[in-house]
Amino acid sequence: SAAIGASYGGSIGLTTTSGPGMALKTEALGLAMMLEIPLVIVNIQRGGPSTGLPTKTEQSDLMQAYYGRNGEAPIPVIAASTPSDCFEMAFEAVRIAIEHMTPVILLSDGYIANGAEPWKYPTASELPKIEVHFKTSLDEGEEKFLPYKRNEKLARPWAIPGTPGLEHRIGGIEKQHETGNVSYDPENHEFMVKMRQAKVDKIADYIPLQTIDSGAANGKVLVLGWGSTYGTIKSAVLQLQSQGKSVSHTHIKYMRPFPKNLGEI
């Protein structure tokens, strides 16, 4: 709730947890999705269910990240593959959250969290710029603020509380298209459900295409992985390649939506 409040107030809210904590945050995640505000939730996965294996690693929360909210509540999901990759994917989670006005789930796990590797720390000038655009006034010809009027990315405006002329309703009850007024109309609800899904799907236009990590693009066998299995899979594939096997490896970082060319690979 504090992270949601930070995002509502114009900062980027970020919270970290593990599987059981994700279960407890389910209702709040649904609220953040309905509010359509930028937020990052990091799930450092461990063995489950319940208390499970709290000191052991497991990649068991992917379906929870996809569907672990009531109703139809799509949230983008990305995953780090190595300790150094955590920085890049955390940065990417913030970028997606801000530019697309949505909560983002970043998956890691105990293996990555307890791992280490050499890594060159990037300078600020080396990082891509994240564009932050706060709504500060009504646009020319705009008679009243429409908090759910969308841009080309289907993202709504980010209006800071207290900005004169931009007062609007906020909360978990379904909103009317564009006006943000409370609406129980079934046709509007269907429209908004599809709109929120379309917004997440459209993120695929703004993420990198999938690449082959090792091996030929036309190999006979493709090993597909995600998360902390990266090093293990790569080592196994390289060993098979040294034996003359036609094996390739690709590792997915963008779990929802997938890169647009993933099916072609």
Model-derived segments and spans:
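A general structural-boundary detector
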Residues: 52, 73, 80, 183, ...
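A short small-residue
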Residues: 71-74, 176-177
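Flexible, low-complexity linker and terminal segments
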Residues: 89, 94-265
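Short, flexible turn/loop "capping" segments at secondary-structure junctions
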Residues: 68-71, 215-216
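Thiamine diphosphate
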Residues: 1-67, 76-97, 242
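A generic, residue-level signal for flexible/boundary positions that often mark functional hotspots
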Residues: 16, 72, 249-252
